[in-house]
Regions:
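Active-site-adjacent structural elements that line small-molecule/cofactor binding pockets in enzymes
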Residues: 1-140
């Protein structure tokens, strides 16, 4: 279902009408205007569990991977290595996101291949002060 939806969305970014009859979706003449300013459209980061083959195969076809429930840098390194094998052009720019709790050192994740570090606040303890603290720590 997701693969089919992504194919429709990325085709619609061309600005040309998209006609599609698939297993899950049917669209006739859909297009997105204005087209994305970035050639090729908006970067797509695919989320998935590290080490699971299907999300990694899907992520390899797009511009980034956002692993969920990442527990340690080794998981990320294994996923990055597998993505390098799966991608058509492993040398092309590619984003790998590490979402980590506040106070977690992002350096081991960067060494494992993360290109983005997002602070993952606990949903049940989110506060404005906690967010301000992280911003203050990151910006000096």
């Amino acid at each position: 279902m997701l693969d089919e939806a992504l194919a429709i969305v990325t085709a619609a970014w061309s600005g040309e009408p998209v006609h599609h009859r698939g297993e899950h979706y049917t669209v006739d003449g859909v297009r997105f205007l204005p087209r994305p300013a970035r050639p090729g459209g908006v970067p797509v980061w695919v989320a998935g569990f590290p080490g699971k083959p299907r999300p990694l195969r899907r992520a390899a076809r797009y511009q980034g991977f956002f692993p969920v429930n990442l527990e340690h840098p080794d998981q990320l390194a294994e996923s990055v290595a597998r993505l390098s094998e799966l991608r058509d052009d492993p040398g092309a720019p590619y984003d790998v996101v590490a979402a980590l709790p506040p106070g977690t050192d992002p350096a081991p994740y960067a060494a494992a291949g993360a290109t983005w570090h997002l602070v993952e606040f606990p949903w049940d303890a989110l506060s404005v002060d906690a967010v301000r603290s992280v911003i203050r720590d990151r910006t000096g």
